[in-house]
């Protein structure tokens, strides 16, 4: 059996981890294993391939179950554990591995992220702490087109978050890497670009300023900050070159071509360890070691053979890496380059060496820009228009000047002399100053892309195949049909009789979108925090991804968990009208008696009263949206006293099909008279799973269910969509209907929301 065939079986067996709605049980896995063993004895190649694929499928499922074990068993109760610190920001965020539990070693260790508290003494990677822990299963917000933090955490082997109740250090010594990093940080303090130097050299990106990260994102150069294939392969190449040069001084019988190869891989492994062996670096080392073994075999391997074997080795070592977007981006980049150079090789023009190098770089960057477009849109929901020019400057500068200078300085830092080290750091710092001067000179190039452009982004692949096969002459009908299919989503128009309500998963806040005919109105804008807000992080990219243009905002009240994203949204769309009960400048009133039409829908305000002196939650603007058949009552954070006042006069006008649960399901709201008077079918609650108030309240939830409501909340369902049409209404949620995946489930204690 060929090794590439085994690689295909590995990839095929583990790929279902990406799409399974839930993991099979133990009995199912036992049956599959037995069935695969039976198939293996059938002397037919295809059957044996199926058997091998089934065995790798079982291996992938067992690996996923192993990671989820901690989240399913350690939550709820206090745990006595020994934690080895793997990374820290030196303040309140610490990454660790639980190595011992209740006095017993556990294997493999479970990843843990601790937030919000300082440890009793100075902390660094490599220390071991005895802790009394209160841990939680990882749980992330889930929105269509948003960052999937829960999937990311599982791919990083970090199924737990939590806090420590008590902590005492057992092993106070830092790891050698941490000591070396601390020494570098002290040395680099005088240099303006020290944070970027540490990011490039040691993989320490926590201290890189947000402004720098935004520049690199907007110019499509953020990939240079990851310790990945580019850096590690260059370290291996540099080490192999030095070893090969040293062989000149050896006797002929000691010179073997394998020695530079093995030495380069060993040096690359040391560098990967020095940078913290982060997942991208670890995957690169697995791929590099696989390539080295293929090379040592003495056989000729094609680019596709190497690609299959490397990807298979990575997935065999770590099956849940299939969830990692960085792995998919790296694998797609390599596959795109193999395809590009096979189907569109660089022209062999007679040029001077310098010009030929420039042409080769332009050819490479053109291929990677065009062919990676589909993956970039799927992962980042946008592209950088300046990435082509930016990478023409950044890749050669960073690869051939900055990184070698940093690597040399890191070596000289251990041995001296000091004057040479300072010179190397200075040159590396100045090269970065030149790089970011160039990047800052470029116009803002990042644009958010709507989902409907996804298929058209495959056009470079399609056109390249058509051109190379001369298909536009031999198969013109198929070429036209293929082009039309890629453009089909762009021609689709929203049905005029349909409109949608979206409840976004913004955590402990509220953001709802009413959409019709490509236009939208927002009811509240989520939260704000010191580093950002829901508008910038979620709502704006979400609107772009769904090709919706907002025309107005309704603010229920002034609390920050409801208006947090407003400023960011107004920065992008400054002409939006705003309705609120706040009497702020440029705000239209949202008080009892106000009514308006929008896209054929009738909006009517039912609370507060004109001239009301209420403040805070009880001053929330209650709005009813009605299409003549179905309706929604949006209530903000209104509480029981205001509910009673509203119902005492206007109870006949609040009946609705759907009710947005007031105040995130708090006991202070959702009085029984309100629930009964609305007489709705569905209750929609927005909250975070882990909130200090344990909302939504189980008592409130049961109250709605006893009155015949279907209960929907964002912790369990994620983003929720309600589609209204002439045929009625249909509700769907991201976790359960639209994107059901095993890694999106509610892990840990089933009823814990605090």
Predicted regions: what they are:
Residues 1-19, 294, 407-422, 426-433:
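Hydrophobic alpha-helical segments
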Residues 24-35, 329-330, 391-399, 452-456:
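Alpha-helical transmembrane segments of polytopic membrane proteins
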Residues 1-77, 161-164, 176, 283-284, ...:
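N-terminal leader/targeting segments
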Residues 155-287, 292-293, 422, 596, ...:
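Aromatic-rich juxtamembrane segments at the membrane interface
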Residues 54-223, 533, 537-541, 545-549, ...:
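Membrane-interface helix/helix-cap signal primarily in integral membrane proteins
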Residues 13, 83, 326, 372, ...:
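Residue-level signal for inorganic ion chemistry
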Residues 5, 47-50, 162, 212-388, ...:
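Hydrophobic alpha-helical transmembrane segments in multi-pass membrane proteins
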Residues 118-132, 152, 168, 266, ...:
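Non-globular, low-confidence helical/coil segments that flank catalytic cores
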């Amino acid at each position: 059996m060929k090794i590439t065939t085994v690689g295909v079986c590995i990839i095929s067996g583990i790929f279902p981890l990406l799409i399974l709605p839930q993991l099979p049980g133990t009995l199912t896995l036992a049956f599959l294993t037995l069935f695969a063993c039976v198939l293996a004895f059938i002397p037919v190649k295809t059957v044996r391939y199926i058997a091998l694929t089934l065995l790798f499928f079982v291996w992938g499922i067992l690996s996923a179950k192993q990671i989820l074990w901690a989240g399913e068993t350690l939550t709820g109760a206090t745990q006595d554990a020994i934690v080895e610190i793997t990374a820290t920001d030196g303040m309140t965020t610490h990454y660790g591995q639980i190595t011992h539990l209740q006095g017993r070693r556990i294997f493999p260790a479970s990843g843990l992220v601790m937030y919000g508290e300082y440890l009793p003494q100075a902390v660094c990677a490599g220390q071991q702490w005895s802790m009394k822990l209160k841990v939680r299963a990882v749980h992330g917000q889930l929105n269509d087109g948003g960052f999937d933090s829960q999937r990311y955490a599982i791919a990083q082997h970090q199924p737990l978050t939590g806090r420590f109740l008590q902590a005492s250090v057992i092993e106070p010594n830092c790891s050698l890497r941490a000591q070396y990093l601390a020494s570098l940080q002290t040395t680099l303090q005088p240099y303006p670009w020290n944070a970027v130097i540490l990011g490039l050299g040691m993989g320490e990106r926590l201290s890189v300023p947000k402004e720098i990260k935004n520049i690199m994102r907007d110019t499509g150069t953020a990939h240079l900050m990851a310790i990945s294939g580019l850096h590690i392969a260059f370290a291996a190449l540099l080490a192999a070159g030095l070893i090969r040069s040293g062989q000149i001084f050896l006797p002929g019988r000691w010179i073997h071509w394998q020695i530079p190869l093995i030495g380069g891989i060993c040096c690359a492994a040391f560098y990967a360890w020095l940078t913290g062996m982060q997942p991208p670096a670890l995957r690169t080392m697995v791929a590099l070691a696989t390539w080295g073994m293929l090379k040592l075999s003495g056989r000729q391997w094609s680019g596709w053979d190497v690609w299959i074997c490397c990807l298979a080795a990575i997935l065999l070592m770590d099956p849940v890496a299939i969830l990692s977007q960085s792995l998919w981006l790296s694998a797609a980049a390599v596959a795109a380059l193999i395809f590009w150079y096979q189907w569109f090789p660089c022209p062999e023009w007679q040029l001077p060496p310098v010009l030929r190098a420039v042409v080769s770089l332009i050819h490479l960057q053109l291929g990677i820009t065009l062919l990676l477009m589909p993956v970039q849109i799927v992962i980042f929901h946008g592209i950088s228009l300046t990435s082509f020019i930016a990478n023409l400057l950044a890749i050669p500068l960073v690869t051939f000047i900055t990184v070698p200078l940093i690597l040399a300085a890191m070596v000289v830092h251990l041995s001296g002399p000091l004057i040479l080290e300072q010179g190397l750091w200075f040159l590396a710092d100045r090269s970065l100053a030149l790089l970011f001067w160039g990047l800052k000179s470029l116009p803002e190039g990042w644009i958010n892309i709507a989902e409907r452009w996804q298929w058209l982004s495959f056009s470079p692949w399609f056109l390249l195949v058509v051109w190379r096969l001369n298909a536009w002459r031999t198969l013109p009908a198929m070429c036209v049909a293929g082009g039309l299919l890629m453009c089909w989503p762009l021609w689709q128009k929203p049905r005029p009789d349909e409109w949608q309500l979206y409840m976004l998963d913004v955590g402990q806040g509220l953001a709802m979108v009413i959409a019709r005919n490509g236009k939208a109105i927002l009811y509240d804008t989520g939260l704000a925090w010191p580093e950002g807000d829901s508008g910038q992080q979620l709502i704006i990219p979400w609107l772009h991804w769904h090709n919706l243009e907002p025309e107005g905002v309704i603010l229920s009240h002034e609390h920050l968990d409801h208006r947090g994203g407003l400023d960011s949204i107004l920065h992008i769309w400054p002409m939006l009208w705003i309705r609120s009960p706040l009497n702020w400048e440029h705000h239209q009133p949202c008080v009892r008696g106000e009514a308006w039409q929008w896209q054929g829908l009738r909006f009517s305000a039912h609370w507060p009263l004109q001239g009301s002196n209420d403040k805070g939650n009880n001053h929330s603007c209650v709005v009813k949206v009605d299409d003549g058949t179905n309706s929604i009552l949006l209530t903000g954070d209104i509480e029981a006293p205001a509910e009673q006042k509203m119902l005492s006069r206007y109870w006949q006008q609040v009946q609705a099909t759907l009710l947005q649960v007031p105040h995130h399901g708090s006991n202070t709201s959702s009085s029984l008279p309100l629930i009964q008077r609305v007489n709705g079918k569905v209750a929609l609650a927005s909250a975070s799973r882990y909130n200090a108030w344990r909302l939504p309240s189980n008592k409130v939830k049961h109250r709605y269910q006893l009155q015949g409501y279907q209960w929907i909340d964002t912790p369990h369902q994620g983003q929720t969509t309600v589609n209204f049409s002439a045929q009625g209404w249909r509700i769907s949620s991201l976790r359960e209907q639209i994107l059901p995946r095993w890694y999106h489930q509610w892990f840990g204690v089933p009823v814990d929301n605090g």
